[in-house]
């Protein structure tokens, strides 16, 4: 039982490091939205408009 405890901690630390490095490079967001097309200013939502738009409703 004492043998598996350090391996579990090492696996947990490695998982956290991979998630942090993927978040820094921005691959996590792209990986989750591969099938969606990015619309204006790289936003995956359909009804998203830029802030400088004059139209009050999309």
Curated annotation (Swiss-Prot):
One of its GO terms (cellular component) is extracellular space. Keywords: Angiogenesis, Developmental protein, Differentiation, Gastrulation, Hormone, Secreted, Signal. Disruption phenotype: Zinc-finger-nuclease (ZFN)- or TALEN-mediated apela gene inactivation induces embryonic lethality due to heart dysgenesis around 6 days post-fertilization (dpf). Mutant embryos show cardiac dysplasia ranging from a rudimentary heart to no heart. Embryos have minimal blood circulation, with an excess of erythrocytes accumulating at the intermediate cell mass (ICM). Larvae display variable posterior truncations and, at times, tailbud duplications. Posterior tissue defects range from loss of the ventral fin to complete tail and trunk truncations. The keyword Electron transport does not apply. It comes from the Eukaryota. The keyword Ribosomal protein does not apply. This is Apelin receptor early endogenous ligand. It comes from Danio rerio. The lineage of its organism: Eukaryota, Metazoa, Chordata, Craniata, Vertebrata.
